[in-house]
Amino acid sequence: MIFKIGDLVTRNSYHNDLLFKIIDIEDNIAYLKGIDVRLYADSELDDLQLVEENLLIKKKEDREEVTKLQKMIQLDRSEYFYLPGKILHLDGDKDYLERCISFYKEMHLEAYGINIKEKDMKEEITKYLETYKPDIVIITGHDSFKKGAKDKDKNANYQNSSNFTEAVKETRKYEKSQDKLIIIAGACQSNYEELIKAGANFASSPKRINIHALDPAIIASLVALSPKNKEIDLLSLIEKTHYGSAGMGGIITSGTMYVGYPR
C-alpha cells in the first residue's frame, strides 16, 4: 500500500488502538502524530493500516464534548451574570492548540493561545503572563518517557518534562499563590510528581499514560466556569477527563469565575 503525508493511520502491532496522522516519511519509516492523544511515534510502513476517517468527525466529537460539559454546568442566567476566568494556553503543537482554542470558543470562554516550542517556554512565559494576565495558564505540548529508561522520578528520562517543570517554576515566580493563578501542566506520560512539586495545580500523568489532546482544556474550562473562592470537587473534576486519575491529577483548587447580580 502507498502512504502519503497527511494520511490517517493506525498501527497493527498496537492492535490499531490509536489514530495518527503521517507527518513525514523517510525510506520505509513513517513519522506519526496522534490525532486524539498528545503523542509522536514512528512506524514501519508495512505496520500501518490506512483509516478512511474524516477529521470532521473529530470536530463533531469535540462539539459533543462541549455539550456534555455545558449540561453539567448549571448557571442561573435569569438574575445573575457571570465573568469566567481568563485562560492562557501555551502549546508545543499547533494542531492541538487550534483544537483547544476552538473548544474554548464553543465554551464561550476568553482564551489566548500561544504556539511555542517546549524548550522555549521557560524563557518566554513571563512575557505572555504579563501581557494577558490570565487566571489559568496551561503549559503543554508533547512528552514521553524515553525508551530504555527505568527511573520514572528523573526528569532527564522524559522528552519534555524538564521543560514543562521549568516553565511552571517561572510561572510561580510571577505569581506564587496557587489560588490566584491556576497552572495546568504536562502532556503524554509526563512526570506528574515533579510538575506538582514545581507548583502546578493540575498535571499529567500519574500513571505515565497518554492523555487526550483536550484533557488540559477540559480542566481549564471547568475551573474557569466554577465560582471564585469555592472549592471544586477534585475527584469529580478529574473524572471529567478522558482517562481520569490515570492521566490527570492535582490539588484541591477553587474556581475563578465571578458571579454578579443583578443581570
Protein language model features and the residues they cover:
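Proline-aspartate-enriched helix->loop->beta-strand connector
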Residues: 129-142, 200
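C-terminal functional extensions of proteins
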Residues: 207-263
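Catalytic cores of nucleophile-dependent amide-cleaving enzymes
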Residues: 163-211
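Short, solvent-exposed secondary-structure boundary/capping segments
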Residues: 28-36
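Short beta-strand-centered aromatic/proline hotspots
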Residues: 16-27
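Short helix-loop-beta junction
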Residues: 101-112
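Short coil-to-beta transition motif at edge beta-strands of beta-rich domains
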Residues: 1-14
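Intrinsically disordered, low-complexity, charged/polar segments
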Residues: 36-81
